[in-house]
Curated annotation (Swiss-Prot):
Residues that, per the record, bind Mg(2+) 1: D7, D139
Organism: Prochlorococcus marinus (strain MIT 9303)
UniProt-listed SUPFAM superfamilies: Ribonuclease H-like
Catalytic reaction list: Endonucleolytic cleavage at a junction such as a reciprocal single-stranded crossover between two homologous DNA duplexes (Holliday junction)
CDD domains linked: RuvC
Protein name per its UniProtKB record: Crossover junction endodeoxyribonuclease RuvC
Keyword Membrane set for record: no
Active-site residue list: D7, E67, D139
Keyword Membrane: no
Superkingdom of this protein's organism: Bacteria
Length: 154
């Protein structure tokens, strides 16, 4: 199974693609979709949708796993929620089934504790994907953790 993990954001959307078809997890790609904060949010949303569309066409994921947020009060809440909506819409448009996980569930699935530290989750990502170096940037590593959670929780 090919899984696309997504760490939503407006300035940076992390993505990670894993393949599990050979009985073990393998990283195929990871990175970020970066938008320019100096341009209109609507244009940034179009860029996110366009880049995500390219990723879907290239990797043909059978499942997308997306981090689910629980916001309190934050000045970036609305824009991140809007970007997340664009991501969900793009996945639906290409008929990619989607699952969502809150951060605590991702930490629990990877590190065994919903209160695990970021480095514990990163160590688990490296171990599960047999990586010698940590994936960079952090948003891409987070997206790989989300993709792995999608595989573990299927």
């Amino acid at each position: 199974m090919r899984i696309l993990g997504i760490d939503p954001g407006l300035a940076r959307v992390g993505y990670g693609v894993i393949d599990t078809s050979n009985g073990q997890q393998q990283m195929l790609d990871c990175g970020i979709i970066r938008t320019n904060p100096g341009i209109d949010d609507g244009v940034r949303m179009v860029e996110i949708a366009s880049d995500l569309r390219q990723l879907i066409r290239r990797w043909k994921p059978q499942l997308a796993a997306v981090e689910k947020f629980f916001f309190y009060r934050s000045s970036t809440t609305i824009s991140v929620v809007q970007a997340r909506g664009v991501i969900i819409m793009t996945l639906a448009r290409f008929r990619v089934p989607m699952v969502e996980f809150p951060p605590m569930q991702i930490k629990l699935a990877l590190a065994g504790s919903g209160h695990a530290e970021k480095d514990e989750v990163l160590d688990a990502v490296m171990r599960e994907l047999n990586l010698d170096q940590p994936p960079r940037p952090d948003d891409a590593a987070d997206a790989l953790a989300i993709a792995l959670t999608g595989w573990f929780q299927r």
